[in-house]
């Protein structure tokens, strides 16, 4: 739909129908929900189809490292992560570190978040460069996830 203020202007307006995966992200809950939906491979492939690759800023990093004794289930992890603890039903961005004894469930952890030993997170969204210190417990709900601001230490 073309906005009425542009009709009759000197602008050249074109449109193209898009029938692929769409998500309406308007608040923290929808951001949380839509990220966790990407754990389902069907949704991930619909958003990032192989025939139309999405090119992003390159950050050459090591593959994710799973240390002996770690546990990961039903999660989507980017490169550069180091997992020593437990991760369940999460989306982890590049460079996230989950230390030994830490438990992370139903979370979206952005780039370079560090979850130190013994910390427990459930229904948490962290912005990038966040540090959750040892033995801290943060718990939200699926309808009201906890959000930690960029570069904060909790």
Where are these regions (language model features)?
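Single conserved hydrophobic/aromatic residue that forms the stacking wall/gate
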Residues: 1-8, 12-13
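Residue-level recognition of well-ordered secondary-structure positions
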Residues: 4-7, 35, 125
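Glycine-centered flexibility sites
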Residues: 5-8, 20, 26, 80, ...
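Extended, small-residue-rich solenoid/repeat segments and analogous flexible loops
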Residues: 14-94, 103
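Structural signal for interior beta-strand "rungs" in well-ordered beta-sheet cores
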Residues: 60-154
């Amino acid at each position: 739909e073309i906005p009425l203020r542009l009709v009759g202007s000197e602008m050249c307006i074109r449109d193209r129908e898009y029938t692929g995966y769409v998500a309406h992200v308007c608040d923290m809950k929808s951001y949380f929900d839509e990220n966790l939906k990407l754990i389902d491979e069907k949704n991930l492939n619909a958003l990032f189809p192989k025939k139309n690759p999405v090119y992003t800023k390159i950050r050459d990093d090591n593959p994710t490292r799973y240390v002996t004794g770690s546990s990961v289930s039903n999660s989507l992890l980017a490169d550069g992560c180091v997992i020593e603890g437990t991760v369940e039903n999460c989306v982890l961005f590049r460079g996230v570190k989950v230390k030994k004894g830490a438990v992370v469930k139903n979370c979206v952890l952005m780039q370079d978040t560090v979850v130190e030993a013994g910390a427990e997170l459930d229904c948490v969204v962290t912005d990038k460069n966040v540090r959750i210190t040892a033995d801290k417990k943060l718990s939200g709900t699926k309808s009201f996830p906890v959000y930690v601001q960029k570069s904060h230490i909790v």
